[in-house]
UniProtKB/Swiss-Prot annotation:
<dbReference type="InterPro" id="IPR018187">
    <property type="entry name" value="Asp/Glu_racemase_AS_1"/>
</dbReference>
<feature type="active site" description="Proton donor/acceptor">
    <location>
        <position position="181"/>
    </location>
</feature>
<keyword id="KW-0413">Isomerase</keyword>
<feature type="binding site">
    <location>
        <begin position="39"/>
        <end position="40"/>
    </location>
    <ligand>
        <name>substrate</name>
    </ligand>
</feature>
<comment type="function">
    <text>Provides the (R)-glutamate required for cell wall biosynthesis.</text>
</comment>
<dbReference type="InterPro" id="IPR015942">
    <property type="entry name" value="Asp/Glu/hydantoin_racemase"/>
</dbReference>
<comment type="pathway">
    <text>Cell wall biogenesis; peptidoglycan biosynthesis.</text>
</comment>
<dbReference type="GO" id="GO:0009252">
    <property type="term" value="P:peptidoglycan biosynthetic process"/>
</dbReference>
<dbReference type="GO" id="GO:0042802">
    <property type="term" value="F:identical protein binding"/>
</dbReference>
<dbReference type="InterPro" id="IPR001920">
    <property type="entry name" value="Asp/Glu_race"/>
</dbReference>
<feature type="binding site">
    <location>
        <begin position="7"/>
        <end position="8"/>
    </location>
    <ligand>
        <name>substrate</name>
    </ligand>
</feature>
<dbReference type="GO" id="GO:0008360">
    <property type="term" value="P:regulation of cell shape"/>
</dbReference>
<dbReference type="InterPro" id="IPR033134">
    <property type="entry name" value="Asp/Glu_racemase_AS_2"/>
</dbReference>
<dbReference type="Pfam" id="PF01177">
    <property type="entry name" value="Asp_Glu_race"/>
</dbReference>
<dbReference type="GO" id="GO:0008881">
    <property type="term" value="F:glutamate racemase activity"/>
</dbReference>
<comment type="subunit">
    <text>Homodimer.</text>
</comment>
<keyword id="KW-0961">Cell wall biogenesis/degradation</keyword>
Length: 255
């Protein structure tokens, strides 16, 4: 089965990594709109247009399924993209919510949603969580993480300063943290380490990783099995510098 993965840049590598590990598909076409990253600071109309333009990119590749591996596009462009597509299109928000439903029974558990400004303002996660009965929800726009990750700054003083800026003012400490941007799993260990090192948490917070969640979602929805193929063929495309994107993929995904 040949599928597409669409992201604003390199954040979708976190989803791609989970897909490659599961070996569900024979061929994956990855498209990063790196010339226009970040999406999270742009208005909803622009993001919808970017999503429709991504559909145009994938048409000649004849994919059978498209994964929108970008939370901002999933929140604001997914429905519009689905209207104009003849193939199934899956976003990352619904799988993440279902992952929480499976793992978190306490409807009053404090849940913190991290995301870009556009994702947080869309209330997509808040609304989806409330539909499942979760009541104790807080959210935080952590858009500065995106350019740091795009520049491969995954540790060090600059990232620590950024986490301190965002997390120090928190009044309610989370039991669950939704990594509501596919860039964020790339610094998941640093986020967990910050909370354990700076707050008196009895146990590490549960981190919801959209890449792992979407693999579980696809397995259930389409009856897919792990190791269905030996190793998927991956082809990279970008609206910006594709050589840079491929170099980042080799570094992060060990291709």
């Amino acid at each position: 089965m040949k599928i597409g993965v669409f992201d604003s840049g390199v954040g979708g590598f976190s989803v791609l990594k989970s897909l490659l590990k599961a070996r569900l598909f024979d061929e994956i076409i990855y498209y990063g709109d790196s010339a226009r990253v970040p999406y999270g600071t742009k208005d909803p109309t622009t993001i919808k247009q970017f999503g429709l333009e991504a559909l145009d990119f994938f048409k000649p590749h004849e994919i059978e399924l498209l994964i929108v591996a970008c939370n901002t596009a999933s929140a604001l462009a997914l429905e519009e993209m689905q209207k104009y597509s003849k193939i199934p299109i899956v976003g990352v928000i619904e799988p993440s919510i279902l992952a929480i439903k499976r793992q978190v029974e306490d409807k009053n558990a404090p849940i913190l949603v991290l995301g870009t400004k556009a994702t947080i303002q869309s209330n997509a996660y808040d609304n989806a969580l409330k539909q499942q009965g979760y009541l104790n929800i807080s959210h935080l726009a952590t858009s500065l993480f995106v350019p740091l990750i795009e520049e491969s700054i995954l540790e060090g003083e600059l990232l620590e300063t950024c986490m301190h800026y965002y997390f120090t003012p928190l009044e309610i400490l989370p039991e669950v943290i939704i990594l509501g941007c596919t860039h964020f799993p790339l610094i998941a260990q640093k986020i967990e380490g910050y909370f354990m090192g700076h707050f008196a948490l009895p146990t590490p917070p549960l981190l919801i990783h959209s890449g792992d969640a979407i693999v579980e979602y696809l397995q259930q929805k389409y009856a897919l099995k792990n190791n269905a193929c030996t190793f998927p063929k991956v082809e990279f495309h970008a609206s910006g510098d594709v050589i840079w994107l491929e170099r980042q993929a080799k570094e992060w995904l060990k291709l």
